[in-house]
UniProtKB/Swiss-Prot annotation:
Coiled coil: none annotated. It is found in: Cell inner membrane. The chain crosses the membrane at residues 16-36, 53-73, 91-111, 139-159, 163-183, 195-213, 227-247, 253-273, 286-306, 310-330, 344-364, 372-392. Belongs to the major facilitator superfamily. LplT (TC 2.A.1.42) family. One of its GO terms (cellular component) is plasma membrane. InterPro entries: LysoPLipid__transptr_LplT, MFS, MFS_trans_sf. This is Lysophospholipid transporter LplT. The lineage of its organism: Bacteria, Pseudomonadati, Pseudomonadota, Gammaproteobacteria, Enterobacterales. Its main location: membrane. Keywords: Cell inner membrane, Cell membrane, Lipid transport, Membrane, Transmembrane, Transmembrane helix, Transport. One of its GO terms (molecular function) is lysophospholipid:sodium symporter activity.
Length: 398
């Protein structure tokens, strides 16, 4: 089966449904595994500052593999690349489940995730195009966030009950994702590789970086999404330490439920972006980005669970409205210049470098005993200022 799918097919085509289902299962496993592994390292009495180190090892794989994964995604059928990547995630989950070093196992999951990301987003541009691509990104983000919502909560609740059972569920879900990938049509390679030598691949990747960075629109998208996801992953770990201090709750489930509220909000915001923002009006999303930082600073001061839920829902809505148009812009312009897989690999490099830097600063702040509420306020203010600066620079460029 080697069809070239028409990009004018209905949005909810068989191919799109297969991609969305596979993505849901894979993202569910990622998020359940994170919270199950955090519970495991807490049980094994690792220090608090080691929690973000777990995620830093994960994102470091994205940075190291960035020159290679885009070419892999563009040189093979993307559905099969996604299947192999989910197989690597399954192997990492089994490493943790069978009692080996959790940092090693989670790093292996990171290798799978790094290979998976360019393929999962790049395939959207092969089965749809134009304004449908914004809507397809909305579906992808909604599927991902629904998986974050259910996976995070399931991981936290199962870990409170039985940590090994939680890890086993993650392995089963990854196995289901591998099977789901078999139903994605085998599409022709988008940009077959010229060379597979590491030097040539690295040179080609950095050439793609230069091409995208010189384009004002894609540079704008790269910076915006990098700031957003760097902030998002840091907020996740902030919640783990903030909940016991601000709310006096010490279980594993509450931080996952709070993260779930962000997920619900992103689904709503992604839907609003698909309705009100087009590729020609991407700058409409920028005020939402600034308000994310303001809302995070206000959130850090809360002392009641209801207010925390409400503010995190608002943060999620703003986040979905902010990031979906930027993703679509990069994919649309990137697929015509360097290939969708390479464009997403460059985006992953930026996003994960931002994550690594922000998590490193957060881990340092925790290690030197900066109050977690103060960390939250400072984090929100700096994010709002960064997005404001990005917006002003884009307006001046126009």
């Amino acid at each position: 089966m080697n069809p070239t799918l028409p990009t004018d097919s209905p949005l909810l085509s068989r191919s799109m449904i297969a991609v969305i289902c596979a993505q849901f299962l894979s993202a569910f496993g990622d998020n359940a595994l994170l919270f199950a592994t955090l519970a495991l390292i807490k049980q094994q009495l690792y220090p608090d500052w080691s929690q973000p180190i777990l995620q830093m090892a994960f994102v470091a794989t994205y940075i190291i593999l960035a020159p290679f994964v885009g070419q892999v995604a563009d040189s093979f059928a993307k559905g099969r690349v996604m299947m192999v990547a989910n197989g690597l995630k399954l192997a990492g989950a089994l490493v943790i489940c069978f009692g080996f070093n959790p940092f090693l196992g989670y790093t292996l999951v990171g290798v799978g995730a790094a290979a998976y990301s360019p393929a999962k987003y790049g395939i959207l541009g092969e089965i749809t195009s134009g304004e449908k691509l914004v809507k397809a990104n909305g579906l992808m983000e909604a599927s991902t966030i629904a998986a974050i919502l259910i996976g995070s909560v399931a991981g936290g609740i199962l870990a409170d009950w039985h940590i090994v059972a939680a890890l086993a569920v993650c392995a089963v879900v990854y196995a289901a994702a591998v099977i789901a990938n078999l139903y994605i049509p085998r599409l022709p390679a988008a940009h077959p590789a010229v060379s597979w030598t590491p030097r040539a691949m690295t040179q080609a990747f950095f050439n793609a970086c230069v091409v995208l960075w010189r384009d004002g629109q894609t540079r704008f998208s790269l910076i915006g999404t990098s700031l957003f996801w760097g902030a998002g992953v840091t907020l996740r770990f902030l919640l783990v330490l903030w909940v016991p201090v601000a709310l006096g709750i010490a279980d594993n489930a509450t931080p996952t439920l709070l993260n779930a509220m962000v997920a619900v909000g992103i689904v709503i915001g992604a839907g609003a972006a698909a309705r009100f923002v087009t590729l020609e009006t991407v700058r409409r999303c920028m005020p939402a980005g600034i308000l994310i930082g303001v809302a995070v600073a206000i959130f850090a001061l809360q002392t009641t669970l209801f207010n925390a839920y409400a503010l995190l829902l608002i943060i999620g809505v703003l986040g979905g409205f902010f990031v979906v148009p930027l993703n679509a812009l990069l994919q649309e312009r990137g697929k015509n210049s360097v290939g969708a897989g390479n464009a997403i690999a460059v985006q992953n490099l930026g996003e994960n470098t931002a994550m690594l830097l922000m998590l490193g600063l957060y881990s340092l702040a925790v290690k030197v005993s900066v109050p977690v509420v103060g960390v939250g306020i400072g984090f929100g203010v700096v994010f709002a200022l960064a997005i404001s600066a990005l917006w002003l620079s884009q307006r001046r460029a126009k």
